[in-house]
Amino acid sequence: MANGFGSLYVGASGLQNAQNAINTTANNLANVDTKGYVRQQVRYADKNYTILKDSRVNVNMQQSGLGVSIGDVVHARDIFLDKTYRQETGRMSFYSARYETATYVEDLMQELNGQQFKRSVSDLWQAFQEVSTKPADSTNQNLVLQKADLLVSRTQKLYSDLQNYQSNINDQIKDDVDRVNTIGNRIYELNLQIQRVEAGGTETAMTLRDERDSLLDELGNYGRIEVTEDATGFTYVDMEGVRFVDENRCYNMGLKAADGTGFYTPYWPQQSDVEKGQYVPVFRLSGEISSEMNTDIGSIKSKLLVRGDAYGRREDMASEKSYGNIEGCTLMEVQAELDVLFSNIVRSMNDIYCPNTETTSAFTSTDGVTYPAGTKILDEENCARGVDLSLIHI
């Protein structure tokens, strides 16, 4: 009879703990749409055993099990999947920021909708073709002036819009860095709370771990991170190869604003000497962007690249070396190319209507200033003149 009831108790323990496990399943179902919630999984364990015979007499210890119990309720997370997910979401954020910038520039150029920017250049060219047939026709002359004024206005507006977008991205970088610092400080606080809850070894800080894991997932969007957890439940975070959260504190990023533009550069205060003006940047912007080398991770790095560190100018396109300084900086490249285009158009028009020539010998002007040989002056013989053949003064 005792053996019969013993078996019933074993079966009853299985049913009771299965019922408790169903409660955990119900909790999982109730939180399906809860942001940051991690599925909980029940792990069963053996109850105590009853020794039937002394092991010193027999080779094998004869024991009778008392049933099953719930050993622990754990997070159903995988370290490998966590690492991969955070890395790939960071990569997605990197290219999403670049795509957003490219799309915005495309909209400014109105390549798909509206009046294309290149149409303004074509219209000016067509106006010159018209005036070449009848140079003295005031209608054709006014058409050139109108199309030239339109090109100047659109170029100025486009360049200004690109500068404004740079400022907008600069503000986004500041907000992102502030958010990263907030996340890091909260992770450090959660580390301490989790340690206190789990110090006795009898309870898992489920809710706290859920929040911490969610913050780590979010942090992966902003940059390349490495996460390790010790036996006490404390999580260490490295960002861009530098310790960001450890057992002592969270090492917040700083922001250095450039003179003139106000463009921000994130740096590590703990490794920098601010008084001497020596800053260690968080993100390495030089070098090849490659998935193999994991240099294409994080939205902040992407925004730093597309924004650039200044406003693009035609001098940036003067040589291969100078272009290498802005290569990959989307907005600076577009600004520099725009400046080159407009400068070439203006230079070509000047060469036609008011060409220059160099003096073969030194001369003294009417105001008494002496100019050496080789000085560039207006080529009066080949420059444009009015209807009465007089020089045009603007």
Which ranges hold each PLM region?
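Structural signature of extracellular appendage/secretion-system components
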Residues: M1-I392
